[in-house]
Curated annotation (Swiss-Prot):
Keywords from the named record: ATP-binding, Cytoplasm, Kinase, Nucleotide-binding, Transferase
SUPFAM superfamilies associated with the record: P-loop containing nucleoside triphosphate hydrolases
Annotated family: Belongs to the cytidylate kinase family. Type 1 subfamily.
GO CC annotation terms, alphabetical: cytosol
EC identifiers of the protein: 2.7.4.25
GO biological process entries: nucleobase-containing small molecule interconversion; pyrimidine nucleotide metabolic process
Stored PANTHER family: CYTIDYLATE KINASE, CYTIDYLATE KINASE/PANTOATE-BETA-ALANINE LIGASE
Location of the protein in the cell: Cytoplasm
Species of provenance: Shewanella denitrificans (strain OS217 / ATCC BAA-1090 / DSM 15013)
The protein, known as: Cytidylate kinase
Keyword Flavoprotein: no
Length: 227
């Protein structure tokens, strides 16, 4: 990781708009994008494909060390295509099953350590937008700018419901809400890299705010931080 490469971290729980803001920011600045959550989703999917128990820390860590994954820009430059063992899994890793599995493997300390170096390798010129949950606290603690997005569990469940409905998934919003609350509890209280804003992070509540307004606030903070 080059100390000269400017890095912006965007952390927060699921459903707060991290992915959208990160992609907009990376596109606006012409920087690289790291979707760290995708790494854990890919690992979780690999574990499922290879019939590895999600609680088997030793096996998951070994799988992480040999994870064959690539992150490629879409043709339109607005997103990331995720390739696992030569297969495009961009859509597969966004399923609710994979999301829940990713949260479980991310709670394993040795697994997080195994993927730490891989994440830091994404820091290359001209700059990096790192989207995740512990980017500003653990992976890139010296980042030039740190953002932490939040939103109510109810609003995040509604956003996730709409997103999955648009993709043709049959989902229950009450179940989504329960899963979000459960995941928040697990992520916030885990021993390894608990979900929390860095001391020097700008915290933005996206509840009831349009994505354009959130983006403008983030961009203003980033420009002030890297100038």
């Amino acid at each position: 990781m080059s100390e000269r490469t400017p890095i912006v971290t965007i952390d927060g729980p699921s459903g707060v708009g991290k992915g959208t803001i990160s992609q907009l920011l990376a596109q606006h600045l012409g920087w690289h994008l790291l979707d760290s959550g995708a790494i854990y989703r890919v690992l979780a999917l690999a574990a499922i494909h290879h019939d590895v128990e999600l609680e088997n820390e030793e096996a998951i860590t070994l799988l992480a060390a040999h994870l064959d994954v690539q992150f490629l820009s879409d043709a339109d430059g607005k997103g990331i295509k995720v390739i696992l063992e030569g297969e495009d899994v961009t859509s597969s890793i966004r399923s609710q099953e994979c999301s829940n599995a990713a949260s479980k493997v991310a709670a394993l300390p040795r697994v997080r350590e195994a993927l730490l170096r891989r994440q830091r390798a994404f820091s290359t010129a001209p700059g990096l937008i790192a989207d995740g949950r512990d980017m500003g606290t653990v992976v890139f603690p010296k980042a030039a700018a740190k953002i932490f997005l939040i939103a109510s569990a109810q609003e995040r469940a509604q956003r996730r419901y709409n997103q999955l409905q648009d993709k043709g998934f049959d989902v229950n919003i009450d179940r989504l809400l329960a899963e979000i609350i459960e995941r928040d509890e697990r992520d916030t209280n885990r021993a390894a890299s608990p979900l929390k804003p860095a001391d020097d992070a700008l915290v933005i509540d996206t509840s009831g705010i349009g994505i354009n307004e959130v983006f403008e606030r983030v961009l203003e903070h980033v420009k002030a931080s890297i100038s």
